[in-house]
């Protein structure tokens, strides 16, 4: 950050800069995608994915102009722009912001269908029923964060991949929260060994220093963007690119992905051992864990404030879930300290 800021921080993306080129090559190599479009915020990257999917639908699939549809999942959170809140299922994100953008349908996320195995998952059936000749993409989170760390049944992404292949539609995964080591893999979709058609990244991509986001896809999808059809003043600027490149390096140099897996398994097991009447379920992957509470016993926000008084930061969602997302470099000693604080607070209720 300091080194690059003394050389060149911002310039038009019309000009070649070494930090930007290096970052694009690095991100392409680790992800397996041919093309990368950089933006600033996660919401911008989601908007970019929507534009890309629609163009692919019109120019590759032959969907009539202005008729493309994208299927999303209930409980989704993809950002706060007017287009994105248009397909939110949470009234607190959209009340008072209409009229809303058309072109989206909502299906059931796996987790809301309460299936015990992928063979009887009603979510896949729900998505299939929403597909028609104008469907260009399915856009989902591999794990839903704002919904309370909802982890789908194993095999769900594989089934979605098969459905998209069969129906000739794009599978776009929003890994703004789950990507870059958070779940114990570089990307959450790697838990099922599939490859999406599009990937959305943000948050950790900036190394907790600067905003930078990206939409990644194939040349077939990206080449539908022509000069003037998309752009960003600050997207991919040399300073953010340099920081993001270093953030990627540190993921591997410091073995943060392996640490996320190992410490996440330890943290999850310890949380599940807490004997408390207020805990309904503990779920998660890697260092991304949700503790769902019995609603009749306590409010999640109250518990978060109690934990804050103990020196531990966490975030509630929907009144019933506490989310834990510790740094990927966290140690067992730090987690033991946290578990002691969590146990203490839980047992006071």
Predicted regions and their residues:
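Conserved N-terminal phosphate-binding loop of PLP-dependent enzymes in the Aspartate aminotransferase
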Residues: 1-349
């Amino acid at each position: 950050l300091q080194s690059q800021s003394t050389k060149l921080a911002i310039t038009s993306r019309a000009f070649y800069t070494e930090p930007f080129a290096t970052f694009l090559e690095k991100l392409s190599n680790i992800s397996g995608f041919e093309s990368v479009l950089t933006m600033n915020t996660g919401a911008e990257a989601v908007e970019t994915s929507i534009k890309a999917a629609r163009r692919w639908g019109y120019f590759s699939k032959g969907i009539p102009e202005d008729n493309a549809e994208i299927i999303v999942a209930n409980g989704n959170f993809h950002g706060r722009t007017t287009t994105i809140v248009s397909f939110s299922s949470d009234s607190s994100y959209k009340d008072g912001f209409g009229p809303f953008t058309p072109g989206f349908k909502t299906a059931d996320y796996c987790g809301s269908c309460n299936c015990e195995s992928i063979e009887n998952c009603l979510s896949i059936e729900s998505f299939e029923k929403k597909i028609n000749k104008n469907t260009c993409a399915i856009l989902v989170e591999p794990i839903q964060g704002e919904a309370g760390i909802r982890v789908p049944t194993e095999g769900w992404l594989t089934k979605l991949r098969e459905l998209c292949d069969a129906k000739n539609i794009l599978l776009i995964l929003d890994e703004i929260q789950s990507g870059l080591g958070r779940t114990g893999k570089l990307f959450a979709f790697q838990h099922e060994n599939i490859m999406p058609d599009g990937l959305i990244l943000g948050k950790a991509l900036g190394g907790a220093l600067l905003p930078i986001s990206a939409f990644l896809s194939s040349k077939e999808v990206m080449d539908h963007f022509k000069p003037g059809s998309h752009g960003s003043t600050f997207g991919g600027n040399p300073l953010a690119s340099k920081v993001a490149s270093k953030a990627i390096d540190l993921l591997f140099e410091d073995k943060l992905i392996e640490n996320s897996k190992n410490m996440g398994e330890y943290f999850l097991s310890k949380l599940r051992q807490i004997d408390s009447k207020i805990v309904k379920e503990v779920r998660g992957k890697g260092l991304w864990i949700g503790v769902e509470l019995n609603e009749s016993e306590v409010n999640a926000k109250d518990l978060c404030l109690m934990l804050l008084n103990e020196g531990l930061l966490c975030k509630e969602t929907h009144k019933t879930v506490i989310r834990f997302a510790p740094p990927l470099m966290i140690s067992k000693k730090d987690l033991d300290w946290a578990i002691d604080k969590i146990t203490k607070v839980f047992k006071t209720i």
